[in-house]
């Protein structure tokens, strides 16, 4: 089992879209994947249609036992655990690690979507991740967030760039750049990723290629 955090202290850089797309692509590649929303705002939870979940990651981090019956599944073939606003409270730093060790079934890959700020839930994610991936575009805003993230942890942080320009300071960066499109929001329909709604499009293929590179880094190819 490998754990990755999709993290950036900057907002608006495509972090949640990336976490969702990686989970879909990993499932397409035959990897049993669990996606966990660790953002108190619950952007991913709402995107996937879990507006009023019965149980959330906060419940499991504060003592609720997770069973296979309580584990939400999606039409895109990955398992999902939603978030709620209680993630803003102080949680024991070892609570996520303990929870992941007691999962009711084995997973090849666990993807953690994190808050776009320096929250306790981000610290939890960094404490358990085998590798951290952060989306970076050509803006100074996202580059600063990358450097800030690298200063926070000893875990390897790899940039995933988008656009034509790869900033030197991003290194190490994934060998595949994401294609971003102004039409992307229109292609994400309902609770489905662009990998489902525009399966053979260039944008979807770029996310698929990035995910395969991630699996190679993790030794899961």
Q: Across the structure, where does each feature detected by a protein language model lie?
A:
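Inter-motif core of Ras-like GTPase G domains
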Residues: 121-139
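Glycine-rich phosphate-binding loop used to anchor ATP phosphates in small-molecule kinases
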Residues: 104-121
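Beta-strand-loop-alpha "switch" segments that mediate conformational coupling across diverse proteins
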Residues: 160-198, 207, 213, 217
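Acidic-aromatic/histidine active-site loop/patch
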Residues: 1-3, 160-162, 221
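Walker A/P-loop phosphate-binding motif and the immediately C-terminal alpha-helix
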Residues: 2-40
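P-loop/Walker-type NTP enzyme "switch/lid" segment
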Residues: 28, 32-105, 189
């Amino acid at each position: 089992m490998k754990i990755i955090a999709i993290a950036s202290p900057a907002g608006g850089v495509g972090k949640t879209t990336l976490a969702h797309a990686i989970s879909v692509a990993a499932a397409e590649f035959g990897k049993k994947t669990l996606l966990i929303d660790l953002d108190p705002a619950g952007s991913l939870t709402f995107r996937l249609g879990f507006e009023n979940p019965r149980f959330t990651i906060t419940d499991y981090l504060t003592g609720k036992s997770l069973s296979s019956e309580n584990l939400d599944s999606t039409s895109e073939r990955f398992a999902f655990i939603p978030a709620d606003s209680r993630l803003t409270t102080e949680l024991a730093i070892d609570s996520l690690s303990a929870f992941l060790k007691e999962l009711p079934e084995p997973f090849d890959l666990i993807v953690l979507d994190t808050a776009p700020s320096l929250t306790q839930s981000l610290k939890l994610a960094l404490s358990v991740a085998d590798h951290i991936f952060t989306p970076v575009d050509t803006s100074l805003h996202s580059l600063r967030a990358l450097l800030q993230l690298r200063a926070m942890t000893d875990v390897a942080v790899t940039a995933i760039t988008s656009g034509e320009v790869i900033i030197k300071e991003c290194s190490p960066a994934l060998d595949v750049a994401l294609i971003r499109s102004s039409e992307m929001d229109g292609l994400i329909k309902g609770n489905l990723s662009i990998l489902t709604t525009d399966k053979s499009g260039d944008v979807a293929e770029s996310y698929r290629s990035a995910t395969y590179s991630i699996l190679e880094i993790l030794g899961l190819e």
